Amino acid sequence: SGNQVDFGDIYTEGITKITTEDFQYAKKMKRAIKLLAISKKVGDTYCAMVSPALIPREHPLYVVNDVFNAVFVKGNMLGNSMFYGSGAGKLPTASAVAGDMVDAARHLGKIITLFWEPQKLVLAPRDEMAKRFFVRMKDNANPEALFGDGERIDAGIAGEIGFVTPVMTEAEYQKKAEGAEIISMIRIEG
């Protein structure tokens, strides 16, 4: 069974702010930038968000490209598991729509029980999710003074540096980054 989640309650950030320079840093870090939908247990509830993230080469999602999508699940008994297949593009989308139409026609006039709990799941604020952050700043910046011990990344881009923060919550990151001249930020998973 599950609970209803209103999609409007999920923080979403697209890929429009990702630049060529971000990809240069990702390559230097041996990571890929992927648009991820993430749900994590936080206390007694869950936190969910959609945003670009840097993932390492060792992560199974690293190889998901083109019209393919994947769902990566980590369970206490299952361990790590990934479901992978076509999910974007003209033909996969047409196939999914046609499949939905066939299912609707087969079950015309019937009520299909989905085992969802009637109460809405209240999501934890994204501020409570903890992770590392990759930030790009001007080369005269002092990211250690803002974020603490981390790792400087030099991708050979004139006038700027990259920096990987230590693990912190979204709220801690926002507070530390407030007023700083940050060129861009990408969350790090894995």
What is each residue range found by the language model?
Residues 1-63, 68-70, 89:
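Substrate-binding/catalytic subdomain of NAD(P)-dependent oxidoreductase enzymes
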Residues 2-5, 11-17, 97, 153, ...:
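Short, exposed beta-strand "edge-strand" segments with a Pro/Gly-rich flavor and a Y/T-containing core
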Residues 17, 27-30, 34, 40-41, ...:
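Context-gated lysine
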Residues 18-31, 80-88, 92, 150-158:
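Short secondary-structure transition/capping segments
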Residues 38-41, 53-58, 76-78, 138-142, ...:
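Generic structural motif
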Residues 46-136:
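Catalytic, metal-anchored helix/loop core of enzyme active sites in primary metabolism
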Residues 101-190:
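A conserved regulatory-domain signal marking ACT and ACT-like small-molecule sensing domains
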